[in-house]
Curated annotation (Swiss-Prot):
Keywords: Cytoplasm, Methyltransferase, rRNA processing, S-adenosyl-L-methionine, Transferase
Enzyme class: transferase
Gene behind the chain: rlmE
NCBIfam families: PRK11188.1
Subcellular location: Cytoplasm
Name of this protein: Ribosomal RNA large subunit methyltransferase E
Organism: Vibrio campbellii (strain ATCC BAA-1116)
């Protein structure tokens, strides 16, 4: 019995230690967060980002996704980022601080974007966790629905969408909605995403407009 307990706790410790390597690596390389590795892995598999693109980054702070995307799209591209929290400046990124759920913030964001001219909408938004799934999951699904609605307003034909989603109530219906709007939809769980987390990333390409 004690051996079994030891084995389970050792397994948890090893998993935490493995997870920490991403945070440590991010600090060592000057990346804004471990999220940098998530979008890097998605890009390696799905090739969403290309030089010269226009990208919207929702839930951007502290800037891991914007930092990576800016490197790929280069000086010819542009990123419009938004978050409730402040974010240190990144070259090539236009940042708007505010609550994306607020109509005034959404309007201010849309003013910076030409309709149907965005190539990729990225969303790493997550709600403040209350610790009660019956509260947390609807909040999380509300945010991903807002991100999908942003696609309807700004995404160019054949554009792409990548969004963090927590598996649970409303997940299957959301994926169905995305499939109705995009030609190809994949579910990704990057190695740098904690195994115990319910987060996955819906990666959609070929916006039908």
């Amino acid at each position: 019995m004690s051996k079994q307990k030891h084995s389970a706790s050792s397994g948890r410790w090893l998993k935490e230690h493995f997870d920490d390597k991403y945070a440590n690596e991010a600090r060592k390389k000057g990346y804004r967060s471990r999220a940098y590795f998530k979008i890097e892995e998605i890009q390696t598999k799905d090739k969403l980002l290309k030089s010269g693109m226009t990208v919207v980054d929702l839930g951007a702070a502290p800037g891991g996704w914007s930092q990576y995307a800016a490197k790929i799209i280069g000086e010819e591209g542009q990123i419009i980022a938004c978050d409730l929290l402040p974010m240190d400046p990144i070259a090539g990124v236009s940042f708007l601080q505010g609550d994306f759920r607020d109509e005034a913030v959404l309007d201010a964001l849309l003013e910076r974007i030409q309709p149907s001219m965005v190539d990729v909408v990225m969303s790493d938004m997550a709600p403040n966790i209350a610790g009660n799934n019956s509260v947390d999951q609807p909040r999380a699904m509300y945010l991903v629905e807002l991100a999908l609605d942003m696609c309807r307003q700004v995404l160019a034909p054949n554009g792409s969408f990548v969004v963090k989603v927590f598996q649970g109530e409303g997940f299957d219906q959301f994926v169905k909605e995305v499939r109705d709007m995009f030609k190809v939809v994949k579910i990704r769980k990057p190695d740098s995403s904690r195994a115990r987390s319910r987060e996955v990333f819906v990666v959609a390409t070929g916006y039908k407009g």
